[in-house]
């Protein structure tokens, strides 16, 4: 279990995440297939294992892991629009009258309902790790929308979930730009060979660089003309590499081989033990990494009451 992306959410109040109570809460909204006339369903699934006996909360030391699954029927808008257009033309030709918006919308609804049972189904899973002592929920996603879907559903079953995205005192853009401009990152961090530069003007240009020396004259020239760094490839110690963006989203997260090898040794041959060992080691790494990252970005803005 290694996250590939990371969104960090800060609990604004202390929440007693008791595994048994959380298990019962998640069980009140299990994932299920879409019915024939449903566009989408959303619910919780076991993060590891299958079957009714698989727990919805994976507990490893002080850390908890949960997962949710979304199932949706895929109706391409072009297919629906073509069918609506065809039906409208048929009515206007046969009945010699104009079809107005209200009737057109009704026709569209009827066509969607007719197409739904035959639509393809897409399933997607999302994981979230809860670290009560650290006061954070970590979501394995680069999409704030997908993360908010999970958190709002978790809030629904728990009754309350005081949480907000983690923020820092200095805009990540300013820090990343300074690191590239000065050719030196904060202690323990290393600038790699990929970045995105944007002009600060609303319609300004965008430059994306891959496999390029970011200390070179070309990059420095872009910075001198007013562009800022909005995405930056970084490494931390000998443990992680990732892309950090201007919204504090961590993408393309990669755990270095030494960590993965350690998890394999700790986990042994059983799949369940391997899963638990990698999750535990990942969370211990995050517990060390996130405070250092926040400090490098000017320090975290801690909500009152935490």
UniProtKB/Swiss-Prot annotation:
It is found in: Cytoplasm, Nucleoid. Its main location: cytoplasm. GO terms for biological process: DNA recombination; regulation of DNA recombination. One of its GO terms (molecular function) is double-stranded DNA binding. Keywords: Cytoplasm, DNA recombination. InterPro entries: RdgC. GO terms for cellular component: bacterial nucleoid; cytoplasm. Pfam families: RdgC. Belongs to the RdgC family. May be involved in recombination. This is Recombination-associated protein RdgC. The gene is rdgC.
């Amino acid at each position: 279990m290694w996250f590939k992306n990371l969104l960090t959410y800060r609990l604004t109040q202390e929440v007693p995440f008791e595994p048994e109570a959380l298990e019962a809460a998640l069980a009140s909204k299990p994932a299920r297939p879409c019915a024939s006339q449903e566009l989408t369903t959303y619910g919780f699934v076991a993060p590891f294992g299958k079957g009714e006996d698989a727990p919805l909360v994976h507990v490893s030391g002080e850390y908890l892991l949960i997962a949710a699954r979304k199932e949706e029927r895929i109706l391409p808008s072009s297919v629906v629009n073509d069918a609506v257009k065809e039906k409208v033309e048929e009515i206007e030709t046969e009945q010699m009258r104009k079809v107005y918006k209200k009737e057109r919308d009704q026709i569209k609804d009827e066509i969607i309902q007719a197409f739904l049972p035959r639509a393809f189904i897409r399933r997607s899973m999302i994981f979230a790790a809860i670290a009560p002592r650290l006061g954070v929920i970590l979501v394995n996603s680069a999409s704030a929308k997908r993360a908010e879907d999970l958190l709002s559903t978790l809030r629904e079953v728990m009754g309350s979930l005081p949480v907000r995205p983690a923020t820092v005192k200095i805009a990540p853009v300013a820090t990343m730009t300074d690191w590239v401009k000065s050719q030196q990152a904060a202690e323990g961090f290393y600038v790699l060979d990929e970045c995105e530069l944007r002009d600060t003007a609303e319609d300004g240009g965008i430059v994306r660089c891959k496999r390029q020396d970011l200390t070179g004259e070309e990059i420095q020239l872009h910075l001198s003309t007013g562009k800022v760094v909005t995405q930056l490839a970084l490494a931390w110690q000998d443990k992680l590499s990732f892309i950090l963006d201007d919204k504090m989203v961590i993408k393309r997260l990669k755990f270095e081989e030494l960590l993965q090898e350690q998890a394999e040794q700790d986990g042994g041959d059983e799949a369940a033990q391997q899963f638990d060992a990698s999750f535990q080691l990942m969370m211990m790494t995050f517990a060390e990494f996130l405070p250092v990252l926040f400090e490098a970005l000017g320090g975290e803005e801690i909500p009152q009451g935490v």
